[in-house]
């Protein structure tokens, strides 16, 4: 590698708004990164993910316009 063209790679502490912290390496000069979400509080990783109710939308459409009848 060429010297002088790569940024310094330092040990960095990542702090989430939930209070969770972990250590990694980064080019952030301050050695501190503040994150809004992490794997400890993100709904996808915690299992508290909300699934949209698309079936309710179909039922509402059918109630409004009626269910289609086959044309035989």
UniProtKB/Swiss-Prot annotation:
Keywords: Metal-binding, Ribonucleoprotein, Ribosomal protein, RNA-binding, rRNA-binding, Zinc. This is Large ribosomal subunit protein bL31. HAMAP family: Ribosomal_bL31_1 (MF_00501). Part of the 50S ribosomal subunit. GO terms for cellular component: ribonucleoprotein complex; ribosome. Zn(2+) binds at residues 16, 18, 38, 41. Binds 1 zinc ion per subunit. GO terms for biological process: translation. The lineage of its organism: Bacteria, Bacillati, Actinomycetota, Actinomycetes, Micrococcales. It comes from the Bacteria. GO terms for molecular function: metal ion binding; rRNA binding; structural constituent of ribosome. The keyword Zinc applies. Its cofactor is Zn(2+). Belongs to the bacterial ribosomal protein bL31 family. Type A subfamily. Binds the 23S rRNA.
